Amino acid sequence: MLSISSLPETVEIVMKFFVVALSVALTSSRLSAQAPVWQPAPGHTQIQIWPGAAPDARPAKGPEFAKSSGKDDLVAGKQVIEIDNVSRPTMTVYSPTGKNTGVAVVVFPGGGYQILAIDLEGTEVCDWLTAKGITCVLLKYRVPAPRSAPYWGAYPQSPIALEDAQRTVGLVRFHAAEYHIDPNKIGVLGFSAGGHLVAAMSTHFDRRLYPNVDAADKESCRPDFAVALYPGHLAMRGNLSELNPDIRTHITRQTPPTFLIQDEDDHVDNVNDSLSYYVALKNAGIPVEMHLYAQGGHAFGLRRTKFPVTAWPQLVETWLGTIGMIAE
């Protein structure tokens, strides 16, 4: 039974509880204000790629947010915008600003399957492609949280990014007439982890990793061409000259023509990631072109540097002409 003498103490405890609760609420509000969600430029809209819950969905570690890199992580003197905790994947369609070639490219930003470098390896790529008359589809694929095992990482460790990629290519092909593109000229382009996703899409298009959702999933998700820049997760860790068997054993005559770029001084993803994939594609008779450079590092995107690799976009444009995607 509560005595009269204990009331002041009880009131004090209750007041402390409400003060703490209010402090937590205010802190959460400040954190939300400091962590904006990425949005594309005006005139462009993110499209949810799944009409309901995404397959293999798991609770995210926290809300999705975007942030800029620090002063020690500049690329060509500029910050990089990264997106974290993506659990609701979207695609954003950027129409050509130049004469429409009918070609479309689905772009996979890199980020180690932990974050997405959405400007360096996303929107800036779309600016280049659309200026060349190519429709760019930027995929914000799921990266639920850093190392949130077992749903973090490259396929087959985690299926979610590949599921999102398969779904997106099918959607683009299904809406080809609406987007004014040729359904037989849809390619994929990715950087780092996104480069691995390019290889996974090039070798895992014959079977969806998820049950069909709608008519778009009846379309082929095979890319008509593939471009991988400084890809990771391809060479075996114990033997860097050997291609990961999950990619190697799925290379067939239907694997699309492929273009590879990497630097020998890449300190994140070993140059053998590209070399091992190149050899496997060549041995399988797949048209493949590879450019290796002595210097240039990792994660340079399209930003101009002093190194020769900075001219890679022109090489890709020439290659697209040689494989019949655009006029030479």
Residue ranges and their predicted role:
Residues 163-253:
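Primarily recognizes the serine-hydrolase "nucleophile elbow" in alpha/beta-hydrolase
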Residues 235, 265-269:
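Acidic catalytic loop of the alpha/beta-hydrolase fold
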Residues 271, 275-328:
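C-terminal catalytic histidine-bearing segment of alpha/beta-hydrolase fold enzymes
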Residues 102-110:
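Short beta-strand element of the alpha/beta-hydrolase
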Residues 109-114, 264:
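Active-site glycine-rich loops that stabilize anionic/oxyanionic intermediates
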